[in-house]
Amino acid sequence: QINTNNFQIIYPVSFETEAQRVANTLQKVIVEVSKSLNKHPKKISIILQNQSVVSNGFVTLGPRRSEFYTTPAQEFDSQDWLNSLAVHELRHVVQFDKLSGRFSGVPFIETYLGAILNLEVPSWVWEGDAVGAETALTTTGRGRLPSFELAFRTNTLSGIRYSYVKNYLGSMKDMTPGYYPLGFFMTTKLRRDYGTGILDSIMTHVKKNPFRPYNLSRSSKKYTKMNTRQLHD
């Protein structure tokens, strides 16, 4: 393992060279990734899984850690896969720490905290904001890929408009973007129209008013005069 001030990198011995590079990358980007949410995350364990055909990564609070599946995806952007994972998953760490506050890392409580946060904030916010980070802070990112916006662009040019719920949750019948592209465009619109600190303001308000129905939507309404459906439309 590699220990820095901010990360504990856990990896197979055979993967040490790449683990060193991941550690250096994370240390380099942590300030920029956390800046717009005004939250420097606590130290976290990063587990590198190199014996898998899955190309993915995740952050969880029970127990608090992030795992990188290091096999590159066949269809992704032109950037190094581990660099993309570092920025995207680190943004999730910052998001969770922003909302969990002093309860982050507390045994037992953290297990339920993740479920509570996902009730408070819809998936399109988590993922759209993280895609925005990887796009803004790297030379590529999914926000620059034509294939990423394919469904949105096709429907728009065809004069097809679906509801917020359908675009978010998807359809077995019609082509819809899903919550990654939806979230990217909605969070980008928020930053473009209300400044880079708008998500910080909204998430802070969510944190101060826990367990409210439609918490994210109501917090958005406070700062933008629009709930999530109005923002989508």
Predicted segment positions?
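Acidic/His/Gly-enriched intrinsically disordered linker/tail segments
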Residues: 63-66, 80-85, 93, 98-196, ...
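Juxtacatalytic substrate-recognition/specificity segment
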Residues: 1-116, 120-122, 139, 215
